[in-house]
């Protein structure tokens, strides 16, 4: 599984292909698209102008869902680490937008400080006001997963009577702003209490136009039995069909994305396969980052072109002296007809036009006399960018990506899916080498319980004093812990990396499993006090 992932020097580095294409996109935007946006006030009607940080930033994943669907737990499951300032509980615990990003030390940065940082891609969030900025923060922590991607945690979307309480800022508009800039949108649903509230429907509507980025996760699926899960899945697909409004079916992943034992383990194999598919999607984000930016720039350019035609048409229809206000009202009322006329005259696809009702509302606040007439040179530059410059970048992107070292998201839960017998591999594939454990003469903390673990070990019928990976897996799966967690335990326990466990390694694995079941975390590397005594001696003599 994930055979294309390499553990070499690519970690933390972006391929040269992405840097080259990204710099070209920045130059094209500044020289050919931005002048048109400024001339026709595109930022006042749609999204504000892009900055260098929008092009240079890491891929971002937006996690959204109703309260208590497991959004924060999902993020902590991916990172295998708690997020600073986060809380987990059945009530709406996340009341703000949290940008989870890499940092050398753990800490949080408040929203007002975040939007003035030129290195972060959040400067254009300033117009949403102080109420929103007080509900926005960045959580920084040293984590290998965050070296490749950033994750946006969102407030729990309210349901029932709670959704009538105002947030004090335009929540759907903020979601739309993030949706335009992220690489992947994950919508979480709770299999145990499936519902789509009015606010959630409005939030999903704000994501319209970005359906290609959306992935749906049916979380907490271990709380229901197989027959109930089938009914819940069918109900979810029916509800999504009503809300999303596209004929295409969204990809739905089913699982239980936290590091606790499965409550109903009947569908364990299904959850494993679904988790692997979702992880592949996330791990591929760094490789496809430049392509996504190119795609989003083309989408933006097409909208800017249509916007220029609309604004210039309204300017042309305005009288020079009298009756300006009445004419403005007439033009806004006739906007659907104007859209159809522009579409036929300039041979533009209906999908390139903005939402007519929203455009009518925005136009009410603008002075049409300050609009500009059509500037053919600006439009020619835009058409040249779409027809010539972007087309030249496509083969360059493909060629340079082939020549570059492919790097994916590593660390956290992604590491556990590739460890020992818990990795999906072909029959001839060998277990990958891992990092060696530490050595020390300190007392082994597992000794006091080793007799208990030895009884289990010998009942599993080891061959030549060692337990094979398949036998160990059968026993470990019985603990109902997720495969990604068991994979990390295997990596820590198989100290000599021979793909089998001797009595000491098995005792170590049992100790780590018990610690995890009691709610403790797993170490990133094996601490010196946990390294089996015989392995310390072997390593010492080898040196």
From Swiss-Prot:
Gene3D superfamilies: 1.10.268.20, EF-hand (1.10.238.10), P-loop containing nucleotide triphosphate hydrolases (3.40.50.300). It comes from the Eukaryota. Detected in lung and adipocytes. Detected at lower levels in heart and skeletal muscle. Residues 91-92 are annotated as: G2 motif. GO terms for cellular component: caveola; cytosol; membrane; perinuclear region of cytoplasm; plasma membrane; recycling endosome membrane. Residues 481-516 form the EF-hand domain. Residues 521-543 are annotated as: Disordered. Residues 534-543 have a biased composition (Basic residues). Keywords: ATP-binding, Calcium, Cell membrane, Cytoplasm, Endosome, Hydrolase, Membrane, Metal-binding, Nucleotide-binding, Phosphoprotein. Residues 219-222 are annotated as: G4 motif. One of its GO terms (biological process) is endocytic recycling. Residues 243 are annotated as: G5 motif. Residues 320-340 are annotated as: Mediates membrane-binding. GO terms for molecular function: ATP binding; calcium ion binding; GTP binding; hydrolase activity; identical protein binding; protein domain specific binding. This is EH domain-containing protein 2. It comes from Mus musculus. The lineage of its organism: Eukaryota, Metazoa, Chordata, Craniata, Vertebrata.
């Amino acid at each position: 599984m994930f055979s294309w992932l390499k553990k070499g020097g690519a970690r933390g580095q972006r391929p040269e292909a992405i840097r080259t294409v990204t710099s070209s996109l920045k130059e094209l935007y500044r020289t050919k698209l931005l002048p048109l946006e400024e001339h026709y006030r595109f930022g006042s009607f749609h999204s504000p102008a892009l900055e260098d940080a929008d092009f240079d930033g890491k891929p971002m994943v937006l996690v959204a869902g109703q309260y208590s669907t497991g959004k924060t737990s999902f993020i902590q499951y991916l990172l295998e680490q708690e997020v600073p300032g986060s809380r987990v509980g059945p009530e709406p615990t996340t009341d703000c937008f949290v940008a989870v990003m890499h940092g050398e030390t753990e800490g949080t940065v408040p929203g007002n400080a975040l939007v003035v940082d030129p290195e972060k891609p959040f400067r254009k969030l300033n117009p949403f006001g102080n109420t929103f900025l007080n509900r926005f923060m960045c959580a920084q922590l040293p984590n290998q997963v965050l070296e490749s991607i950033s994750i946006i945690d969102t407030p729990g979307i309210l349901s029932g009577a709670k959704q009538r309480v105002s947030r004090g800022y335009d929540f759907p508009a903020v979601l739309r702003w993030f949706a335009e800039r992220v690489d992947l949108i994950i919508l979480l649903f709770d299999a145990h209490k499936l519902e789509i509230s009015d606010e959630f429907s409005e939030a999903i509507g704000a994501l319209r136009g970005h359906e290609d980025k959306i992935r749906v996760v049916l979380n907490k699926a271990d709380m229901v039995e197989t027959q109930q899960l089938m009914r819940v899945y069918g109900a979810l697909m029916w509800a999504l069909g009503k809300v999303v409004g596209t004929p295409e079916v969204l990809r739905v992943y089913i699982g239980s994305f936290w590091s606790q034992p499965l409550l109903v383990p009947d569908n364990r194999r299904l959850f494993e396969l679904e988790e692997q598919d979702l992880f592949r999607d996330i791990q591929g984000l760094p490789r496809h980052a430049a392509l996504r930016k190119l795609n989003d720039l083309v989408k933006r350019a097409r909208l800017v072109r249509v916007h220029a035609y609309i604004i210039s048409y309204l300017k042309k229809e305005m009288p020079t002296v009298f009756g300006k206000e009445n004419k403005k009202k007439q033009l806004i009322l006739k906007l659907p007809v104007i859209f159809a006329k522009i579409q036929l005259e300039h041979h533009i696809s209906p999908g390139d036009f903005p939402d007519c009702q929203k455009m009518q509302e925005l136009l009410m606040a603008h002075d049409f006399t300050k609009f500009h007439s059509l500037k053919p040179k600006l439009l020619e530059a835009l058409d040249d960018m779409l027809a010539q410059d972007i087309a030249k970048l496509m083969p360059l992107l493909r060629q340079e990506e082939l020549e570059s070292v492919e790097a994916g998201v590593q660390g956290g839960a992604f590491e556990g899916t590739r460890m020992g017998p818990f990795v999906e591999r072909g029959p001839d594939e060998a277990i990958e080498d891992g990092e060696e454990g530490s050595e020390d003469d300190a007392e082994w903390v597992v000794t006091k319980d080793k007799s208990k673990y030895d009884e289990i070990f010998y009942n599993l019928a080891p061959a030549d004093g060692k337990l094979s990976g398949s036998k160990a897996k059968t026993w470990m799966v019985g603990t109902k812990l997720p495969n990604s967690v068991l994979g990390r335990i295997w990596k820590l326990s198989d100290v000599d990396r021979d793909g089998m466990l001797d009595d000491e390694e098995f005792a170590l694995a049992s100790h780590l499993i018990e610690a995890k079941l009691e709610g403790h975390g797993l170490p990133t590397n094996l601490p010196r006090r946990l390294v089996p005594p015989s392995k310390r001696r072997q390593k010492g003599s080898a040196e």
